[in-house]
Amino acid sequence: MVKKVLLINGPNLNLLGTREPEKYGTTSLSDIEQAAIEQAKLKKNDSEVLTFQSNTEGFIIDRIHEAKRQGVGFVVINAGAYTHTSVGIRDALLGTAIPFIEVHITNVHQREPFRHQSYLSDKAVAVICGLGVYGYTAAIEYALNY
């Protein structure tokens, strides 16, 4: 079982709770992060969830590199718009060889065509999209039991 999971959120996800609530709901990123941390504590086996959010691609890449040094065993990532553009984030995930799940709050396949392409999906253990913020709960649960 994985003891340390890193939850990464990319650009504009810091606006959750206020950004387009008809699409993303009213749950804040802070609420999502706190729920993930509590979910790990409920395991009562010293599991932990670390959280990180950045609007900057390079900072996300640096955090993935740091995760390897910290002994993170699984990454749950909502790369936001970088999902559709970032070879750098893909390469960081592959370079560290940390297994990961890609999460999206909305069903990206029901949205604009440019959102249908993911640079991460083909390398992810799983992709969860369209389940709202519950997608994070499902991904964290899987990661903690990996």
From Swiss-Prot:
Involved pathway(s): Aromatic compound metabolism; 3,4-dihydroxybenzoate biosynthesis; 3,4-dihydroxybenzoate from 3-dehydroquinate: step 1/2
Positions marked as site (Transition state stabilizer): 19
Subunit structure, as described in the record: Homododecamer. Adopts a ring-like structure, composed of an arrangement of two hexameric rings stacked on top of one another.
Give the source species.
Answer: Candida dubliniensis (strain CD36 / ATCC MYA-646 / CBS 7987 / NCPF 3949 / NRRL Y-17841) (Yeast)
Q: Spell out the catalytic residues.
A: 24 (proton acceptor), 104 (proton donor)
Q: Name one GO molecular function term.
A: 3-dehydroquinate dehydratase activity
What does the UniProt function comment say about this protein? Is involved in the catabolism of quinate. Allows the utilization of quinate as carbon source via the beta-ketoadipate pathway.
| Class in the EC hierarchy, top level | lyase
Q: Which domain of life is it from?
A: Eukaryota
Q: Which Pfam family, any one, appears in the UniProt record?
A: DHquinase_II
Key words, A-Z: Lyase, Quinate metabolism
Gene (name only): DQD1
Per UniProt, substrate binds at 78, 84, 91, 105-106, 115
- Which reaction is the catalytic activity of this chain? 3-dehydroquinate = 3-dehydroshikimate + H2O
According to its UniProt entry, one GO biological process term is: 3,4-dihydroxybenzoate biosynthetic process
Per the UniProt record, which EC number(s) apply here?
A: 4.2.1.10
Q: What is this protein called?
A: Catabolic 3-dehydroquinase
Against CDD domains, the record matches this protein to: DHQase_II
Disulphide-bonded residues: none
- Name the protein family: Belongs to the type-II 3-dehydroquinase family.
